[in-house]
């Protein structure tokens, strides 16, 4: 993987990731949004449909794919790209977040995490080394280190111990990744909770270990938006300017805009797909809750500014009808729209950065939503 920083507008960055895959060279324009394909599928969508929304890279979930179908099945197909028939780049998370979200079902030790398999109840163990091995079998183009996602709220002492263990795990991840002869990219993950001092230590140590890109982890876990913005604004300038920066698990459209304002290049979130299945649809000036009875007779398209298949062919009334009847097509059409909305947003962001008018774009974005622009700490 190579990263080229093309231009900036304030702290916002316009770049390009390039990947050499067996099928040829693929580029990912940044800032980029990655749809989430937890079980080797973006729910309800074929790879061709996902690509048609503008997606250039997907996220796969190491933890869930390890439990089902498992490494052996993956190896029989070749890798995750062959298994799901998406031959463009894939980033996989390390499984850490899913393990830590199991709560009482897991026990953290220096070696790794022992936990109860949520599918069949058996006791299993996931370590930094094992995570690297699973992601190697998945053929991930971007591999994430195994870390502990520090919960919120956390005391300074807990956040410090957690961050220090994540650094030790980062080194073990790096070592096993190299031992496997993996030629793909490995990203480090900055932890440290809401404490700037800990974030600084984490970033400096990860840079010393050396990674192909750096993620900001442990955010969007319940902390107030102001806290997330503060930590993001503090952390991103600590990271190498010539490496991609990834904000994990975030988020709402305004979160993407705020991340880009603070120098982030990559995002992922289940929000566009999950919200689509629940009838919450993102449009130019906010959200349409398609289950609302006022749409029963509405013959207008979902968003007149959107070029997606759904908006070009169907009315709000039809989408309301499909949802009311529990038709699978409704969830699919909603998903197509929401994913396209996110990709259009990223396209607009990239254009604004290229034209060095990103600040104007931010003002226009919030004006359409009828919301105030969140302040920058250093403004």
UniProtKB/Swiss-Prot annotation:
GO terms for cellular component: cytosol. The active site is at residues 93, 268. Residues 249-255, 273-277 are annotated as: RNA binding. GO terms for molecular function: metal ion binding; tRNA-guanosine(34) queuine transglycosylase activity. Belongs to the queuine tRNA-ribosyltransferase family. NCBIfam families: Q_tRNA_tgt (TIGR00430), tgt_general (TIGR00449). This is Queuine tRNA-ribosyltransferase. It comes from Mannheimia succiniciproducens (strain KCTC 0769BP / MBEL55E).
């Amino acid at each position: 993987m190579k990263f080229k920083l093309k231009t900036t507008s304030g702290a916002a960055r316009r770049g390009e990731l390039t990947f050499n895959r067996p099928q040829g060279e693929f580029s990912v324009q940044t800032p980029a949004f990655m749809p989430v394909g937890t079980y080797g599928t973006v729910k309800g969508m074929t790879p061709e449909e996902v690509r048609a929304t503008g997606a250039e890279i997907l996220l796969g979930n190491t933890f869930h794919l390890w439990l089902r179908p498992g490494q052996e099945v993956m190896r029989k197909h070749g890798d995750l790209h062959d298994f799901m028939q998406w031959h463009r780049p894939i980033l996989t998370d390390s499984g850490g977040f899913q393990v830590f979200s199991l709560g009482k079902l897991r026990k953290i030790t220096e070696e790794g995490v022992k936990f109860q398999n949520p599918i069949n109840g058996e006791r299993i163990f996931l370590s930094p080394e094992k995570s690297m091995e699973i992601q190697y079998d998945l053929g991930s183009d971007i591999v994430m280190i195994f870390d502990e996602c520090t919960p919120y709220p956390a005391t300074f002492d807990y956040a410090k111990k957690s961050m220090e263990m994540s650094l030790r795990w980062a080194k073990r991840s790096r070592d096993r990744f190299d031992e496997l002869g993996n030629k793909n990219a490995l990203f480090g993950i900055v932890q440290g909770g809401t404490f700037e001092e800990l974030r600084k230590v984490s970033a400096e140590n990860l840079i010393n270990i050396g990674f192909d890109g750096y993620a900001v982890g442990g955010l969007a876990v319940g902390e107030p938006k102001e806290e997330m913005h503060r930590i993001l604004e503090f952390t991103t300038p600590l990271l190498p300017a010539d490496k991609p920066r990834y904000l994990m698990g975030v988020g709402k459209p305004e979160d993407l805009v705020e991340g880009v304002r603070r120098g982030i290049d990559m995002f992922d979130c289940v929000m566009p797909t999950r919200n689509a299945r629940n009838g919450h649809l993102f449009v130019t000036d906010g959200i349409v809750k398609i289950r609302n009875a006022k749409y029963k007779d509405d013959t207008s398209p979902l968003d007149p500014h959107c070029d997606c298949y759904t908006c070009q062919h169907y009315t709000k009334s039809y989408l309301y009808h499909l949802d009311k009847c529990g038709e699978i097509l409704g969830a699919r059409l909603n998903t197509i729209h929401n994913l396209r909305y996110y990709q259009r947003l990223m396209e607009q962001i990239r254009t604004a950065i290229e034209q060095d008018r990103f600040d104007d774009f931010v003002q226009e974005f919030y004006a359409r939503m009828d919301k105030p622009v969140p302040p920058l700490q250093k403004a």
